[in-house]
């Protein structure tokens, strides 16, 4: 009789486990593959999100490759990847082709020079006027550092831009009312490549996403580079209200509060071909917009507002 009671008890426990335990675990487990390609700007953040998501869902494989926003949108629309990483606004013609953007975070593009630039004192104290930037990258009228920043001598400016179709160049050009193809300079592939080109050239000037101008661990400017402050009010000097470039944290706060202009601040997107149908992709996107947001600031990005996040979540329902 005693053994019979034990057997019945085991059966009941097994039944309850199968009913309430195993099924719940099975429901919570997520499996599948997710592929992303595109913007260098979003690449470090996407890698961090993938790492954290896989800790919770080891059955999910996430493949990520960088190559510029242009590649990301093309790969997404041709179903080469599940999602394209895009660091610019989505064009109307891309929307017509099926592009379905979900904003996931914000960052910005900044001008950079070599830390050994002979005109560095003038650059840092006077800042980059919008007119000066326009005459460096758009018209090409400014050929020397003296013309651009009022320093002495006739030392030439070596101008760099991006060779790949990318959000950083598109947003930097938009700051001057133009498009990427209007930017002048020696073309360099990728964010890391452009940063390296300026680091190697004491007379070089370029632009980078903030994740490549600052060290995400120390929050300081990358060794060998200096971020050029924008003379936002155009008074020929960097005032206290415009001086927020020493650390990544200060710049992020300036972007979040609107002190830093937009553009060159902008939202970053994950884009699918049509509204996402693949379950693992939808779950990853929803996680990014909820629990995944806690990793945004530590990775050197800016969180979206609660209103914006709720709007993006609604797009996935």
PLM regions and their residue ranges:
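Basic/polar N-terminal segments that are highly enriched at the extreme N-terminus
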Residues: 1, 22-27
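Flexible loop/hinge segments at secondary-structure junctions
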Residues: 26-317
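Bacterial N-terminal signal peptides that target proteins for export
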Residues: 1-12
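Bacterial N-terminal signal peptides
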Residues: 10-21
């Amino acid at each position: 009789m005693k053994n019979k009671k034990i057997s019945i008890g085991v059966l009941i426990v097994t039944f309850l486990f199968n009913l309430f335990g195993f099924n719940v675990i099975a429901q919570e487990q997520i499996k599948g593959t997710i592929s992303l390609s595109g913007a260098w700007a979003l690449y470090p953040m996407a890698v961090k999100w993938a790492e954290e998501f896989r800790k919770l869902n080891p059955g999910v494989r996430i493949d990520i490759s960088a190559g510029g926003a242009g590649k990301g949108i093309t790969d997404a629309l041709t179903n080469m990847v599940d999602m394209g990483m895009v660091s610019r606004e989505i064009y109307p013609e891309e929307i017509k082709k099926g592009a379905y953007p979900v904003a996931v975070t914000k960052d910005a593009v900044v001008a950079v020079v070599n830390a050994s630039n002979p005109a560095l004192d003038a650059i840092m104290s006077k800042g980059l006027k919008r007119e000066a930037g326009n005459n460096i990258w758009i018209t090409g009228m400014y050929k020397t550092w003296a013309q651009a920043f009022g320093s002495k001598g006739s030392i030439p400016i070596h101008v760099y831009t991006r060779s790949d179709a990318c959000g950083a160049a598109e947003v930097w050009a938009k700051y001057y009312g133009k498009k990427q193809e209007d930017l002048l300079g020696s073309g360099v592939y990728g964010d890391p490549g452009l940063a390296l080109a300026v680091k190697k050239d004491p007379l070089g000037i370029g632009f980078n996403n903030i994740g490549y101008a600052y060290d995400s661990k120390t929050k300081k400017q990358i060794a060998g580079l200096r971020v050029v402050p924008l003379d936002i009010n155009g008074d020929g000097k960097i005032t206290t209200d415009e001086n927020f470039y020493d650390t990544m944290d200060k710049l992020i706060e300036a972007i979040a509060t609107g002190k830093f202009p937009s553009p060159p601040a902008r939202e970053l997107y994950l884009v699918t071909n049509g509204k996402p149908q693949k379950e693992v992709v939808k779950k990853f996107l929803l996680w990014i917009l909820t629990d995944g947001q806690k990793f945004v600031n530590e990775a050197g990005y800016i969180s979206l507002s609660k209103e914006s996040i709720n709007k993006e979540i609604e797009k996935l329902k």
